[in-house]
Structures are given as C-alpha cells and as structure tokens.
Regions:
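Active-site loop/helix belt of alpha/beta enzymes
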Residues: 2-11, 18-133, 137-141
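C-terminal accessory subdomain/extension
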Residues: 139-253
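Acidic active-site catalytic centers that drive phospho-/nucleotidyl reactions
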Residues: 15-17, 51, 185, 198
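Glycine-rich loops and low-complexity Gly/Arg-rich segments
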Residues: 16, 36-41, 71-75, 113-116, ...
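Short aromatic/hydrophobic contact patches that present stacked aromatics
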Residues: 13, 19-22, 162, 201
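Conserved beta-strand segments that form the floor/walls of ligand-binding pockets within enzyme
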Residues: 13-15, 47, 108, 162, ...
Length: 253
C-alpha cells in the first residue's frame, strides 16, 4: 500500500512468533524478511514485538524464558541489519511484573490499566465500576417463584428487587440463580432466578433499601475478579463483555 501511494520510509511494526503461534514471522524467517526490507524503500521497521503466552503462570516459566530468549536473538538480528534504532517490546502486564529484564524499550500494559494483576488475580487499584439502580421492589411469598422457567426458588418470604441490567448489557447468565451477588448499599444481594435480557432480580430481604438506590455489579468493594472466578474465566472477558448500550462516564483526577 505504501509503495502504491509513493510513500517512502513509512514506519512499520514487525511481529515475531516466539511460541504463541497466533500471528507473526517465525524466527527462521527473519533473514528473508531483512532481505525483502532491504530491497525496497517504501517501509522501514520502527519496532519489533512478540507476545508472551503464559507469563502469568509459574508453571510456564521455562517456556516464557525461552520465548524471551528467542525474541531477543531475533530482534538483535533485525536490529543489526539497520542503522536506526528499532524499539523492542514483548512484556504484557504479568511480564512487566515478573520479568523486569525483558522490558526492553517498551512494554504493553493491558489488564493492569484496569487495576487487575493477572498473576495473582488480585486488584491493584480499581479504575472501573459497573453500576445500576433499583427499578422496583416487591414482596414475594415463599411458595412463589421468580423469573423465567420458575428457576428462582425462595426459602422464605422475600423482598425481591428488579434492576435494569441483563445479559444484553453483558451480565453473564451463569451469574444467576444465586451463583453470584451484587452490592446494594454495601451489602450482598444474590441474583435470584435466571438473568433476563434487560433486567435481573436480586434478593434484598435483609437490606435496607428503596427504589432508586445504587446497585454495584462490580467495582471497588466487589472486584471484577470475584465475578471472573465464579465464571471460571478471566477478568478481560468480564470487562470486554459490557455492551455498547451501557453508558460510559469517564472521570479524570
């Protein structure tokens, strides 16, 4: 594309496959890559990078060290062929923490930007909160059920609140039926019955609350890692599942 536009020395970023086998040039392709780059003037390498496959797991330490070693050798080979400085980066959030010697000229902080440590699965400093408000509260007798397929069964007469958030907003259906909870006025309110598309129900029997009160799905007091642990997944999935129809508000200190 650069050649067709008559552009010269357009900076590009070169990805190396050091073991994740997703994208990138294999290390043994580097000599041919250098030769092709040398035969043209449209683009020049600005940076070279790779991705660590298991930097957040102790069991993968030997593999991670091998990846770093492979990357270092291949990037040195590329650098030696060009007079200008080529930036190197391979560390993700866990890599930054666990392999400081592999930070090179740049790093790529991913999940850490959102205050989550993928190595310990603990919070650093939370920066995101998903919240809603109570839409309606009703008294439901023990013998009745709540939600679709009558999945929400009660062990006592209960106060059930409906909140306007559902799986179309990114609230996973597997959190329903008491598998997880949200916070109402700082107290745990379990999800009752199936999570619906636009609404879900929570048990507020023992909570002093009223319609319009704030409900925290995840945030400072309820880390996103709690939900990811329940679902057997990673915090990334929870955060990226929040749909576009959920209003975003950005704060700047």
């Amino acid at each position: 594309a650069a050649e067709k536009e008559g552009v010269t020395n357009f900076p590009i970023h070169i990805k190396l496959d050091t073991g994740m086998h997703r994208l990138g040039f294999a290390p043994h392709d580097v000599p041919e890559l250098i030769a092709r780059l040398k035969r043209q003037t449209s683009v020049i390498p600005r940076s070279v990078f790779s991705h660590l496959a298991g930097s957040d797991g102790d069991q993968f330490d030997s593999f991670t060290r091998k990846q770093i070693e492979t990357f270092e050798k291949a990037s040195e080979e590329l650098q030696s062929a060009f007079p200008h400085k080529i930036l190197r980066h391979i560390c993700n959030t866990a890599g930054i923490q666990r392999y400081p010697g592999a930070q090179f000229e740049m790093v790529r902080l991913g999940l850490g930007l959102y205050g989550v440590d993928p190595y310990t699965n603990q919070m650093l400093h939370n920066v995101s909160t998903l919240k809603t408000t109570i839409l309606q509260i009703r008294d439901v007798p023990q013998e009745d059920s709540v939600g679709y397929s009558r999945k929400g069964r009660l062990n006592r007469d209960s106060r059930i609140a409906a909140i306007p958030i559902g799986y179309a907003d990114g609230l996973n259906r597997r959190l329903g039926n008491g598998n997880a909870y949200c916070l109402v006025n700082g107290q745990k309110a379990p999800y009752v019955g199936n999570i619906c598309m636009d609404v879900c129900m929570i048990d507020v029997t023992d909570i002093d609350c009223r319609e319009g009160d704030k409900v925290v799905i995840f945030g400072d007091a309820l880390p996103v890692t709690v939900l990811s642990d329940v679902l057997g997944t990673i915090p990334y999935e929870i955060l990226t599942s929040v749909s576009n129809r959920v209003k975003r508000i950005y704060y700047q200190d």
